[in-house]
Structure formats: C-alpha cells, structure tokens
Amino acid sequence: MTKDILILAVETSCDETSVSVIKNGRDILSNTVLSQIESHKRFGGVVPEVASRHHVEGITTTINEALVDADVSMEDIDAIAVTEGPGLIGALLIGVNAAKALAFAYDKPLIPVHHIAGHIYANHIEEPLTFPLIALIVSGGHTELVYMKDHLSFEVIGETRDDAVGEAYDKVARTIGLNYPGGPQVDRLAAEGEDTYSFPRVWLDKDSYDFSFSGLKSAVINQLHNQRQKNIPIIEANVATSFQNSVVEVLTFKAIQACKEYSVQRLIVAGGVASNKGLRQSLADQCKVNDIQLTIPSPKLCTDNAAMIGVAGHSLYQQGRFADLALNGHSNIDLEEYSAE
C-alpha cells in the first residue's frame, strides 16, 4: 500500500495568514485562513507593517488550527512548503521563518514555493492539470499569460507593462467611493449598470500578449473628475460596468488568442481577480465557442491561501526540489527562473 504524502503549507505573502495540510497533492485536509481585511479597510489598502504584525500574532495559532482540523500531528507531516515570494518582504519572512523553525525542530524537508505557481496549482485541486495549457494570472500584483508544457514549466508569454489588473480595480473603486477591497465591490456594482462610457481597450502591439491598464484607469479617474467639476450626476454602476467590460474584453481576447497560437485546448485562470463574475462568464462564453476547456478555481481558492501552496509544493516534493535552512523571503522572483529545468 502506497503511503500518503502529507504537506504542511504556509502562506503569508500579503495580508492573509494561512496554513494548510494537503494529502497526496490534491486533497485538502485543512485550510485555515486568518484574514486581515478589517484591519486594512480604514487605510484603503494593505499597510505592510500592519500586515507583518498580524502575521506575527497569528502564525502559531494558525499552524495549530490547521493540524487540529486535519487531525494530524507534526510527526505525520512529510514536508513543509512555504511561499518564499513574491510578496511583501516583511510578511513573507514571518511565514518563511515559521516554516524553517518547524523544518528544523521536526527534521522535515523544506519546500520553497513561488506564490504565482501556487495560484496556478489551485486549479489542480478541482481538476487535474493536463498539458499543454495557458494560464491567465490576474491578481492585485500580477497580470500574466503563462504557457505550460508540463508540471512546473513556466514560460511567461505576456505580462502587464504598468498596473496589474487588481491594482486598476482598487484605484477605480476608490475613485468611485467604494470600500476596500475594491475589486469585489466593482464586480457587484457592474452587474447592476449599463455600458454607457466609451473607456479605452488597450491592445498594445499587434500579436503582443502584454497588458496595460494605466491608461484605462486614468480615463476612468479623469471622467469622474470632469463630471464632478461640472456637477454632472455620476451613475456609479454604469462606471463600474463600462470599466469592467473594458478590462474583461482585453483579458478574454488575449487569453483565447494565446490558446489558438500555442495550439492549446486548456485554459486555466489564477489569482484573486479570477473570482470576478464578469470575467468568469466572459471566459466561459468564449471558451465554449472556441472549444477550449476552461478551469477556474472556486472563489475561496482564488484568493491567497495555503492549500494552493501545498498543492504546488507536492509537485516540487516529487521532483526533490528542497531548500536548506538558509532559505529567505524574496519580494520579487521571476517565474521563469523558478521553472523546472
């Protein structure tokens, strides 16, 4: 009988303290998430120092809760996976040092995981990854198109040249007057409005899979500023709808085109913005028309969580890609450099 492989995973790259236990690469035995949204809401965004303090306060309790929920002990764990980056360096160090302490104390292998690889592997939980595939990464800090020919093989074929899509959502939300986090609020409001504004769609160079959202963001901000200056009433839902349609149209078109050019029949979506209902519907419609298999994680697995780190960590475990206790956190790590040889 084959022994079950249990991975304890730790994620502290931004404003969620999360610990998970993953069995055999796909089964979630526990996935404890301690959110900091309420603490950051009054600032209108994540404050790194506040985030780090909350991670320090919550990491030990979160580890214990994850083990209890999974009904396992540290002796049962085969390896410890942890997000090494990219992310907020102070936040990352809390998780990395906690993972190193556990690895040392219990003599367990230590697995460093790229945060974006984790988001990609969240899809593997719901449906096994099949290759080749295109991954559309949409989050607060990243917007990328990635070609994967096999497990842990990452070729970035497109990325944002300025703002990530999540950043654009948050800035537009603040301009409209919505509370943090802005992305989900814009998505909800967009479902109630009409596309009455001609906001730009930024395509960039012909055949380019890069993205740019700073011009769109500025167009929305300038439109609202001009209307307020002239005392012209603003219908917030229409602004949200028009903005979201501009974003979704570009993301969908480039993702589908990438699938066609690379002769790929599988598209996966990863990152916090993958929970956006407008984007999910647009991709579903176009994938159906183009006979492309679409996988998007359930919303709870789109946002930062340790389960996705554990799933990616299991693939790294199988390849024997471990770190020693000199492991450190890194605010920036190139996904392609992290790719398997």
UniProtKB/Swiss-Prot annotation:
Q: Where in the cell is it found?
A: Cytoplasm
Q: Which residues bind Fe cation?
A: H115, H119, D304
Which keywords accompany this UniProt record?
Acyltransferase, Cytoplasm, Iron, Metal-binding, Transferase, tRNA processing
Does the keyword section mention Thylakoid?
no
Cofactor(s) recorded in Swiss-Prot or TrEMBL: Fe(2+)
Q: What is this protein called?
A: tRNA N6-adenosine threonylcarbamoyltransferase
* Gene3D superfamilies attached to this UniProt entry: 3.30.420.40
Q: What is its EC number?
A: 2.3.1.234
Sites binding substrate sit at I137, V138, S139, G140, G141, D170, G183, D187, N276
Query: InterPro entries in the record, alphabetically?
Result: ATPase_NBD, Gcp-like_dom, KAE1/TsaD, Peptidase_M22_CS, TsaD
User: Which CDD domains does the UniProt record give?
Assistant: ASKHA_NBD_TsaD_bac (cd24133)
Q: Which family does it belong to?
A: Belongs to the KAE1 / TsaD family.
Q: List, alphabetically, the PROSITE patterns matched.
A: GLYCOPROTEASE (PS01016)
What domain of life does the UniProt record list for this protein's source? Bacteria
Please provide, in alphabetical order, the Gene Ontology terms of the cellular component aspect for this entry. Answer: cytoplasm
Q: Which BP terms in the Gene Ontology apply to this protein?
A: tRNA threonylcarbamoyladenosine modification
Function in brief = Required for the formation of a threonylcarbamoyl group on adenosine at position 37 (t(6)A37) in tRNAs that read codons beginning with adenine. Is involved in the transfer of the threonylcarbamoyl moiety of threonylcarbamoyl-AMP (TC-AMP) to the N6 group of A37, together with TsaE and TsaB. TsaD likely plays a direct catalytic role in this reaction.
Q: Which NCBIfam families match?
A: gcp_kae1, T6A_TsaD_YgjD
Tell me yes or no: is Acyltransferase among this UniProt entry's keywords.
yes
A molecular function annotated in GO for this UniProt entry is: iron ion binding
Q: What class of enzyme is it?
A: transferase
Pfam families this protein is in? TsaD
